[in-house]
Regions:
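Catalytic core and acceptor-binding pocket of nucleotide-sugar-dependent glycosyltransferases
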Residues: 90-242
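A short acidic, often aromatic-flanked loop/helix-cap motif at beta-alpha or helix-coil junctions
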Residues: 16-25, 78-79, 165-169
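Conserved donor-nucleotide/metal-binding helix-loop-beta segment in metal-dependent transferases, i.e.
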Residues: 54-85
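Short beta-strand-to-loop acidic/aromatic patch adjacent to the donor-nucleotide binding site
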Residues: 43-55
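Long amphipathic alpha-helical coiled-coil/heptad-repeat bundle
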Residues: 43, 85-86, 130-133
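Short His-Asn-centered micro-motif
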Residues: 49-50, 72-74, 92
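Active-site-proximal specificity loops/subdomain of glycosyltransferases
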Residues: 2-44
Length: 251
């Protein structure tokens, strides 16, 4: 924290109890607790930038103006077809932007501030055909914002096409092709997924190999999803059965 103050002496710091950061479970509870967001009601948005995130562009104001309440890197998974990725939703919370007031409202409405669901809520989620992790008692913060919040008509989650311009996490090389070799606003877990892709890019941003510490993480097994897009020579895609093209050739 002192390093930040050396760069920006006027930086304001809000401290939280250490127990919130002792393990993933406690951190997830914090991220779903209205008390966190009520500390920042003087602001419209919170940008969550965990230690393994990185910002490429000065676009924060732009993203705050996009009329979405939650945005993070899209969840995509490789398939047996090298041209095909399975899109499961939006998105990762390690580098994410949330609307403060709307998040408070949604948390209070769904009564999930403590990170727990009732039997009735779990049954409802099962009827919706959601992934099995959605029905466990402790709901991960990523899952909460990307799926549970979709059931609140007043809470807006970013679309895939918005999220892919906001951040990469899984399958960054494929998403880079999809975006016609344009980097997003930022990324998350760049030291864990596809290091061969990230090392040259991070070198361009001043991070030499000696400064990069990797903890390699295998990509999670693919589970059922509804949205499929196909990668071809220049990222010609088909999303949800509708053809789209990122170049002039659409063969």
């Amino acid at each position: 924290m002192l390093a930040y103050l050396e760069v920006v002496p006027t930086l304001g710091i809000t401290r939280m109890s250490d127990h919130h950061f002792g393990n993933v479970l406690e951190y997830n509870r914090l991220r779903k607790n209205t008390k966190l967001y009520k500390k920042f009601t003087g602001y419209t948005h919170i940008l969550f930038h965990e230690l393994d995130a990185f910002v490429f562009k000065d676009e924060l104001l732009y993203w705050c103006q996009q009329n979405v309440d939650y945005i993070g890197a899209p969840w995509v998974y490789r398939t047996n077809d090298a041209r095909c990725l399975l899109h499961k939703g939006v998105g990762n919370s390690g580098f994410s932007l949330v609307h403060v007031d709307h998040t408070i409202r949604s948390l209070e409405k769904l009564n999930l501030s403590a990170g727990r669901t009732t039997v009735a809520q779990r049954a409802s989620l099962m009827k919706l055909g959601r992934h099995h992790k959605l029905v466990r008692t402790e709901i991960n913060v990523d899952v909460f914002f990307s799926f549970l919040a979709e059931n609140d008509p007043e809470f807006t989650v970013a679309s895939f096409n918005q999220a892919v311009k906001f951040s990469f996490e899984l399958c960054p090389a494929e998403l880079f092709e999809y975006c016609q070799h344009e980097l997003p606003f930022g990324c998350h877990a760049w030291g864990q997924y596809d290091r061969d892709f990230w090392i040259p890019i991070m070198n361009l941003f001043g991070l030499g190999k000696k400064q990069i510490s990797f903890r390699k993480r295998a990509q999670k097994p693919m589970s059922p999803g509804k949205k499929i897009f196909y990668l071809k020579e220049k990222s010609i895609i088909s999303l949800n059965g509708n053809a789209h093209s990122t170049n002039k050739e659409s063969g």
